[in-house]
Amino acid sequence: MTRRYVNIVLAAALVTAAATNAASAQEVVKVGASFAMTGAGFSAAGRQAVAGARLYMQHHGNTVAGKKIELILRDDAGVADNARRLVQEMIVNDKVNIIAGGITPTVLAYGPLVTQAKLATVVMISGASVTTTASAYFVRTSFILSQSSWIMGEWAIKNGSKRVVTLVNEWAPGTEAETAFKQRFTELGGQIIESIRIPLANPDFAPFLQRIRDLNPDTAFIYFPGTQAGIFAKQFAERGLAGSGIKIIGPGDLTDDDELNNMGDQMLGMVTAHDYSAAHDSTLNKKYVDDFKKANNFRPNFVSVGGYDGMHLIYEALKKTGGKTDGDTLLAAMKGMKWESPRGMMSIDSETRDIIQDIYILRVEKINGELWNVEFDKFAEVKDPLKAKK
């Protein structure tokens, strides 16, 4: 049996399964979520997205447009091959009507599957600009790394930065953050005096800190995953650079609300740009944070609102379609939708199916003994700048 024959049979099975799912007069709408719930590096994101999605269902019930909503969760451990297999199984065996998407490598892996099956897929975690180009059935409610990095470049110019060193990990998110920041910063007249790339795994910051000292920029734009930002800031202070006048800036997942208090006081004063802070001052967000913490015993972060808003998009689209779940009808209902989220006002770009949202400038401050990302500036209705430039 040839690979081509197997692919043809699989494609036929996917299309048949999806058509059957959409056409049936079922009383249940199944949302199949493939997230990393275990595995190194990505399980925290899966935990946050699921908690956000479940909280939305707690707030709004599990029935919409006369249909019961069932959230089916599968753990792909952040592995692309796992995600592709699990999504295929959910389409064919579980007969899901909608897919909820996770981190970038996994959603890119099953893009062709949901395209063949014509299933609306709400991306709740991935932040790569390229994500929504992988399938015409992808729509995003998470975040876009280039949005915050681009805005950070604009804010830096407006606030006196002229000579900047960029320091990022050698991986796709790091290079995307660097690219977006550099494009905006340089087109507004700033100078990048050096772009430094460092290993992703267990980096030794010492030589890079010395290089920053030697270059003597007024600002360092950095981007590292997880708790590495805290390690960097600690070593930055220990080597006397904190008093050198060099400012540290970066995209907001550097100071992730879920990890911030574990990073320590060396994060105080760090300025970032992001779409969400748990300290966002709105009635809706205060209720969201209180209810989230009661349900989960940890603080919500920017990934959690991707899950919460993802379920909102699904619910509101089903209301508009009267419960119809075929992908084309749902996508048409989702495009252009606008609503108030715990993060603020947001909408779905009708052309790119990407998120349009406010980007906040945040400073780490200590309030009542806890570290928080406190908003002090805002850029309204930001699109994905890397798509807008094309």
Predicted segment positions?
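Beta-alpha junction/loop-to-helix N-cap segments that form part of ligand/metal-binding clefts
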Residues: 28, 44-48, 59, 63-132, ...
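Extracytoplasmic "Venus flytrap"
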Residues: 29-56, 74-80, 103, 167-175, ...
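Extracellular/periplasmic periplasmic-binding protein-like sensory domains
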Residues: 233-308, 319-321, 325, 365-368, ...
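Solvent-exposed, acidic/polar segments of extracytosolic/periplasmic ligand-binding ectodomains
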Residues: 29, 335-390
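Periplasmic-binding protein-like
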Residues: 90, 94-103, 122-124, 165-168, ...
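C-terminal segment of classical bacterial N-terminal signal peptides
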Residues: 15-24
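Extracellular/periplasmic Venus flytrap/periplasmic-binding protein
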Residues: 85, 128-130, 136-239, 276-287
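Bacterial N-terminal signal peptides that target proteins for export
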Residues: 1-9, 19
